[in-house]
């Protein structure tokens, strides 16, 4: 006979105790991954929007181009934000020709995490990025 008769069923108990902990750990890994992907996508959108705005001839056109470019880049990155805010600072266009100026684009994206259905995890994570691009100092504005 087997001397370990008292251990029968212990594997089932261990599995029942460890499964929720492993699922929670997996959920944390998914949250971290989503956050990293969102940070990269928002940073790329801010960079592309600032670059697009810096190529414009005036501040009104720059703001319109930057907003459209930010939307296109976020869509291309397949990032689904619950809410998105794009702030464009075009005061660099007020500098006279020959003086340096720049355009800054700041993007805030709220990424949903509620679909993970894990207790203790946030329902959403806010990701922010900002990028500044110089305006050609000698170009007519």
Regions found by a protein language model. Give the residues of each.
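Alpha-helical assembly-interface signal, strongest on the long, hydrophobic N-terminal helix that forms
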Residues: 1-67
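Short, conserved structural patches
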Residues: 55, 59-141
